Amino acid sequence: MERPSSSLVLAKAIRLKNKQAIWCGSLTKRTCLWMGGTYRNGWIDANIKELGSYKIQQDTKAPVITPINQQTWVSKQNFIFRLSDNLSGVQTYRGEIDGQFVLFEMNNKSVITYRFDKERLQRGKHELKLIVTDACGNESIYTHPFTW
């Protein structure tokens, strides 16, 4: 089994406000694939497995949270969202109702669903909160008041 080698890439020319947002990407014919990396003292430290062309980029855009079928959420007793991020990818998501954690299920790579838990969720007014973070630490927060 091969172990990835570590490569240091000079990145002093990039002016950074958020050093966590910097990352290294592997260039292919059509795109730049996210590989991660850590900014340390003006250098990017990233694990690479093969020689090739790489690019240093900065991800400062927060993930996108898109509600799906919002008009039927209460009647169908579930919340559905599509999560996306244009560069480093979605790393974590957390759902809350009235400040309490609720478990969202990942249906596929980008769609999550919460089905109302009738034992924990009482009838009345509530607030849903969804927090999504990408691999560079950018965060989006979606809130939605609802009555059930």
Language-model features, listed with the residues they occupy:
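Proteolytic processing hotspots in large secreted/extracellular or virion-associated proteins
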Residues: 1-22
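Exposed aromatic-hydrophobic patches
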Residues: 5-12, 41-49, 113-119
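Short edge beta-strand/loop segments characteristic of extracellular beta-sandwich folds
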Residues: 7-11, 78-86
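Surface-exposed loop/turn motifs at beta-strand-loop junctions within extracellular Ig-like
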Residues: 50, 60, 132-136
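Exposed beta-strand face motif in extracellular beta-rich ectodomains
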Residues: 52, 77, 124-128
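Proline-centered linker/hinge motifs at extracellular inter-domain junctions
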Residues: 60-64, 126
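Short, solvent-exposed loop/linker segments at the N-terminal edge
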Residues: 70-76
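Long, low-complexity serine/threonine/glycine- and acidic-rich segments characteristic of extracellular
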Residues: 86-148
